[in-house]
Amino acid sequence: MQGRLSAWLVKHGLVHRSLGFDYQGIETLQIKPEEWHSIAVILYVYGYNYLRSQCAYDVAPGGLLASVYHLTRIEYGVDQAEEVCIKVFAPRNNPRIPSVFWVWKSADFQERESYDMLGIRYDNHPRLKRILMPESWIGWPLRKDYIAPNFYEIQDAH
């Protein structure tokens, strides 16, 4: 079933894939990494000016990594907000997705956390570096194929 935003994107010739609706009735779309930045700008201009959250997850061991964006459009009031969920998948051997920091500033720390935990590189992010783990940490702790070290010493811990 195609939602309202998906129909609008089709009408304007914008490449995407409808993934239906989640359990709360929120339309979910899949966007290719190479299309994501331009579609993000279009969605912002269309009225999705609030990035509610961004997260990422490992789809399956050895499989794809996903970056998920929950966008909100408030046109007629807070009680009538329109939401959409965007999923952008990337291969685990070179997970690169365009950053939307320059579209929604609130993506800053959220994209950094996704980089820190899963190793997704957000191209053109101004400060893409670890935010939770020490800079010396090896690997991406939330990947399903991550092997935790037996011992890790944090220098200068008090």
Swiss-Prot record:
It comes from Oenothera argillicola (Appalachian evening primrose). The keyword NADP applies. This is NAD(P)H-quinone oxidoreductase subunit J, chloroplastic. It catalyses: a plastoquinone + NADH + (n+1) H(+)(in) = a plastoquinol + NAD(+) + n H(+)(out); a plastoquinone + NADPH + (n+1) H(+)(in) = a plastoquinol + NADP(+) + n H(+)(out). It is an enzyme of class 7 (translocase). Its EC number is 7.1.1.-. The gene is ndhJ. Its main location: plastid. It is a peripheral membrane protein. It is found in: Plastid, Chloroplast thylakoid membrane. Keywords: Chloroplast, Membrane, NAD, NADP, Plastid, Plastoquinone, Quinone, Thylakoid, Translocase, Transport. The keyword Methyltransferase does not apply. GO terms for biological process: photosynthesis, light reaction. NDH shuttles electrons from NAD(P)H:plastoquinone, via FMN and iron-sulfur (Fe-S) centers, to quinones in the photosynthetic chain and possibly in a chloroplast respiratory chain. The immediate electron acceptor for the enzyme in this species is believed to be plastoquinone. Couples the redox reaction to proton translocation, and thus conserves the redox energy in a proton gradient. The lineage of its organism: Eukaryota, Viridiplantae, Streptophyta, Embryophyta, Tracheophyta. InterPro entries: NADH_DH_suC, NADH_quin_OxRdtase_su_C/D-like, NADH_UbQ_OxRdtase_30kDa_su, NADH_UbQ_OxRdtase_CS. GO terms for cellular component: chloroplast thylakoid membrane. SUPFAM superfamilies: Nqo5-like. NDH is composed of at least 16 different subunits, 5 of which are encoded in the nucleus. PROSITE patterns: COMPLEX1_30K. Belongs to the complex I 30 kDa subunit family. GO terms for molecular function: NADH dehydrogenase (ubiquinone) activity; quinone binding.
